[in-house]
């Protein structure tokens, strides 16, 4: 009852993490810094369970929680009935300090999403080949940029290869980044920079784990740094004084450049290192004070750990590059009674309410109840992410919706239908990212989000995904699966004024939207890919 949140002002209220500010936090914590370790936290949990006489428990951990849960399992296996690791990575071993699975999983994320998308898979090459020209342009010609995030807050930054790396590795916003990077990169090379710059601005917000008032009680940046520097494997020896550690760091990177320069391909090691410290990892702790001999960093040596026979389920999403499938497999292999479950089209963490499907939650609950997962067919039935086919500044650049029986609208009006539906999709993909409930359109207008008993409602006000079409109306969507509906009023593009009703089903692969309405006095009856 006397514990409190770790508050390092130099991190908690910093605009950007630096090696110096992380080191200053360690100095502020002083002799107590090594005590904020996962090992001691796991021991505390065991003491609480003993005091409460709860017997064996079922322990669930996600993301960093999987690290904590594994530490608890190897130190206190007698307390466990079952273990679930959702979005898991191993305690260490081998080259893990370099995060070697990080970049391959990032490449797979975009390539798999493209292969599963009808519009993207029709293009020649892989998604990474679609993105490569934008990377080359940013690498050769970085520039000062400004763009608004989804809330309308402007951000100034240098648009360069490292900013693109942050978008692609950071997965924040998770859905929008997978959905848009391929098309945004193609648009960037074609002269429309805004979609990619918007993603860069949004990612600056998304990779910041602090809440808006930067309260350490909600997220402690100091604790995150202390745990990283005390527990995680590093490319240098944390027992060295910081000055010697920097020399060791530089030597290790020089060797890596010579022996495995493609570790973070398509980005160089230097471009990777210029991402935020807590996403690139390898430089974050170089200045952290040396721990005392009594409390050495990384005390849980992976080579000497004995993993228990506890029934263990590892859940991984095959579009998750933060805790890749390969890392989940490595964690599963350590447990004699471990099993990995891969959720197709799953992102980072798949059993919590905001995941793309309820499959992970269903299987985890079944595992906890019965110690078996049973039928796992749902893991292969999660629908692919619906990628943006292309970005367009003007309606006439888009493919028209497909006319159905009873349609009287011409191709121009059917292109306006496509633009309107893509406008809905653009806002909907950001609905869960808006903390205050209000957002702005790519090229103008606003929208708001309110939760309903079964999902959420978007209210669009003159929302512009293209420059020449404003969309106003409401969108009703379920959280995951079920019927969705949009009632829209269009204004702008030639002869596109009018109203549309759009209906589709969420939670289905290859979902199709049906559209009815009147545009410019012509009846619309059409279909196209769901937003």
Where do the language-model regions lie?
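Alpha/beta-hydrolase-fold enzymes
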Residues: 115-228, 232-233
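Gly/Pro-rich cap/lid or specificity-loop segments adjacent to the active site
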Residues: 1-163, 232, 236-531
